[in-house]
């Protein structure tokens, strides 16, 4: 992609993808590379700026990730963050040692507003520290431009060479004015114009697809999820009916989801493509009969998808390209294990190439983060209910039904889940209308699951012996940890009443308060 870019060099820190996302929020394109990437390759990319990330090591120890002095002599602005700041000082002649006082968490920091990084930042600001080493002596040519009560060098700069070292993490939200600092570096120091915008990305990607595909045929497995839907939209805009999408409806989707996907991508939809819907519900239910173990269910669902897709692919015949909804985090995670100096091409194919007759993979979203994929979807005109769809597991409702999966159990969980999500969405919308903002309790993910427990109840003066539905709602930033959402009790009461009255086969509703850990977000 021929455009101005900033390169993030990864040293193993936990926030590295976040750094790249923050740079892109400044409308500047950014890519992540391993610290092992050859200097000549970095130079050949002609970056407008370089950012060195944090990492878990001590830069003065043998075997620690490092870089050459020549990196700082390219004539390109360099910003070091945490470990990256320490490494910059260490390589250029400063001194880094174990800190007499470690700093973790929110820390009051005093900055020199004459610095280009802090010109519009408050003189006293809150930043996020996370370090056990510190810069005890700055390198020649540097000037200290920020400090804390326990850290004499919270930031240093060498304006002559446009080198900047920051001991804290401006990329995390806990650093109150971190976005300003990164903006000042990327747009100010580096001089980036800020031309990375989604409308331009969509337009350029469509051109690139047309050039690459030519008159060739493309095959895409369309799940109805965000990534494959946006990939389908991009490809359709570029090559029309040269694209064939195979949508396998395994009967384990949310209520009406299969029809929603077809309404957008099918013959009556807004996209010009060949759409094949395979209704394989009974086939899946038959394979899952009597199976109760979660991993066994996952395996059956995955293997059956392969078989169904294989059958359809054989009917279609040879194609030139197999398209995938690979996104940038997949690419980054495949290439930063230390085995490759450059991020490797990531083929998230899951066994498909063995039986699909194709020449090459095409991944139109491989440069985008998840939030950018959603923006691209909106730019393409894909309906919001698809673009902002909640996370949904690959095995679908198969792992939201505890125990054996049957058609009747699928009906129960589909109906209960639809009611639950509808009522939560309604409550959120009403709050937004009244208050002009989303409620603090608004969950990041919420769904209903069917337990394997039946119990006695009384409905209409008659004894019942029916299933219990569990409601799950969590608040989370990264889905690695999560807390149960505090949905208002009156909303939960309405949900409970509707489920018991409207969903045949249910006489109890539970609300799951378990955090992650010890629990997981999904039930199986």
From Swiss-Prot:
<keyword id="KW-0332">GMP biosynthesis</keyword>
<keyword id="KW-0547">Nucleotide-binding</keyword>
<dbReference type="InterPro" id="IPR022955">
    <property type="entry name" value="GMP_synthase"/>
</dbReference>
<dbReference type="GO" id="GO:0003921">
    <property type="term" value="F:GMP synthase activity"/>
</dbReference>
<protein>
    <recommendedName>
        <fullName>GMP synthase [glutamine-hydrolyzing]</fullName>
        <ecNumber>6.3.5.2</ecNumber>
    </recommendedName>
</protein>
<dbReference type="InterPro" id="IPR029062">
    <property type="entry name" value="Class_I_gatase-like"/>
</dbReference>
<feature type="domain" description="Glutamine amidotransferase type-1">
    <location>
        <begin position="5"/>
        <end position="195"/>
    </location>
</feature>
<dbReference type="GO" id="GO:0005829">
    <property type="term" value="C:cytosol"/>
</dbReference>
<keyword id="KW-0067">ATP-binding</keyword>
<dbReference type="InterPro" id="IPR001674">
    <property type="entry name" value="GMP_synth_C"/>
</dbReference>
<dbReference type="Pfam" id="PF00117">
    <property type="entry name" value="GATase"/>
</dbReference>
<keyword id="KW-0315">Glutamine amidotransferase</keyword>
<comment type="pathway">
    <text>Purine metabolism; GMP biosynthesis; GMP from XMP (L-Gln route): step 1/1.</text>
</comment>
<dbReference type="InterPro" id="IPR004739">
    <property type="entry name" value="GMP_synth_GATase"/>
</dbReference>
<dbReference type="InterPro" id="IPR014729">
    <property type="entry name" value="Rossmann-like_a/b/a_fold"/>
</dbReference>
<comment type="function">
    <text>Catalyzes the synthesis of GMP from XMP.</text>
</comment>
<feature type="active site">
    <location>
        <position position="169"/>
    </location>
</feature>
<feature type="domain" description="GMPS ATP-PPase">
    <location>
        <begin position="196"/>
        <end position="389"/>
    </location>
</feature>
<keyword id="KW-0658">Purine biosynthesis</keyword>
<dbReference type="InterPro" id="IPR017926">
    <property type="entry name" value="GATASE"/>
</dbReference>
<dbReference type="Pfam" id="PF02540">
    <property type="entry name" value="NAD_synthase"/>
</dbReference>
<dbReference type="InterPro" id="IPR025777">
    <property type="entry name" value="GMPS_ATP_PPase_dom"/>
</dbReference>
<comment type="subunit">
    <text>Homodimer.</text>
</comment>
<feature type="active site">
    <location>
        <position position="171"/>
    </location>
</feature>
<dbReference type="InterPro" id="IPR022310">
    <property type="entry name" value="NAD/GMP_synthase"/>
</dbReference>
<feature type="active site" description="Nucleophile">
    <location>
        <position position="82"/>
    </location>
</feature>
<dbReference type="GO" id="GO:0005524">
    <property type="term" value="F:ATP binding"/>
</dbReference>
<dbReference type="Pfam" id="PF00958">
    <property type="entry name" value="GMP_synt_C"/>
</dbReference>
<feature type="binding site">
    <location>
        <begin position="223"/>
        <end position="229"/>
    </location>
    <ligand>
        <name>ATP</name>
    </ligand>
</feature>
<keyword id="KW-0436">Ligase</keyword>
